[in-house]
Amino acid sequence: MTDFNLPSIFVPLVGLVFPAIAMTSLFLYVQKNKIV
């Protein structure tokens, strides 16, 4: 992972955006299917 020399903005971008999208998609999935 660290050998790719990625830009310093790419790591926090993935670290923040990916979990946000994952949580949002999961939330919408639960709301759509009424899984409570």
Curated annotation (Swiss-Prot):
Membrane-crossing residue ranges in chain numbering: 10-30
Keyword Membrane: yes
Record-linked PANTHER family: PHOTOSYSTEM I REACTION CENTER SUBUNIT VIII, PTHR35775
Gene it is expressed from: psaI
Principal location class: plastid
Family: Belongs to the PsaI family.
Identification of the protein by name: Photosystem I reaction center subunit VIII
Described purpose of this protein according to its UniProt entry: May help in the organization of the PsaL subunit.
UniProt-listed InterPro entries: PSI_PsaI, PSI_PsaI_sf
Record GO cellular component, one term: photosystem I
Subcellular location: Plastid, Chloroplast thylakoid membrane
Membrane topology, as annotated: Single-pass membrane protein
